[in-house]
Each structure stands twice: as structure tokens, then as C-alpha cells.
């Protein structure tokens, strides 16, 4: 069978393969441990999530204050407290949500306590093992976006367009294409810390998880 390089040469004539370390000079975003924000939900009145495995620390990103620990099996939501701030709320046994102290500005995160932590997003019926959940507000609508912050290789491992029984060279070629697209997007947009109003309004992300590319 063809090698990964031969496959890529067939579909992308004239293209060459470079290691990511050779293109990150002058591009600090590629040196970050987890530079990529993948949009999971956009413009929601609130964000619901679960701890399917492990635990996570819930934090307000503007101050770095971590409000509480979310434990395995718990259901949470993030949204407005009705007084100009945001809160995390935990679902009680009767199904109601109980806000936890303190409130904070509406830029927040859920940070895994362990590598084995798994977040569930009920609205998408999906779970996510790698990365931090990031909650951001749309400047236009005031509603909430949810993004998954993760490393480039974590994202590439999560891409499964080809079945596992395909030749290893095909899977390798797919990984190279996926990595290239992510790096290109990171270079175009830059660090999440520098998202402009348009990017914050759209999704607070570099790409959406249903991006057709």
C-alpha cells in the first residue's frame, strides 16, 4: 500500500510535510500547552454539564477564584444569577438547581482534577475526556458559549473520520491533514486570550466541533 506521504502527495500535489516545531517561531500560540478552543455550544441561555467520571474544579477566569469542586455523578449548570453576575448551580435530589457561592463575572471554566475526568454535555449527548470547559458570553446576545480547551494532539486523537480497520498509513495521513488544519486556524486567529468581539460573538472558539472542514 501507499505510505502516508504518498497519499498526501496524491491529494495535495506540491505539498510538503513540516514538523510543527519548525513553524512556531514567532507564533506563541503554538507554544501553548492547550491552545485550541473547540466550540461545543453557542448562544445558550444557560450551559448544562455533568461529571461522568472523576472530578473538576469550577473557576471564574477573571479572578482565578475557584468556587467549588464538582464530583462524579453530579449535574451542574452555569448561567446568570439575575443580578449581573454568573453562578454555577448544582442539581439537588429533587431536580432543582441550587446556586453555589460565590458569584462572579461570566467568564469561567471547569478544570479536570485528574486526567481521567470525563465531562458530559447533555444537549449534545456527548462526553469529553481531554481539556477544560470554557464558558464565555456573547457580546451581542448576552447568551453563553461553551468551548473545550485542549492541545493540538488531543484534538487530532479525537478526530475519527476513518474506521480503525483502515491501513495505518491512511490514518497517519488523516492525522497530518487534521493537524495542519488546526495549526492553520491557530495561526490565523491567534491565542484565545486575544479573541476579538466577532470571535466572541460567533462562538468563543477557533473552530466548532461540527466544522465541515
PLM regions with names:
Residues 1-213:
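Conserved, single-site charged/polar hotspot
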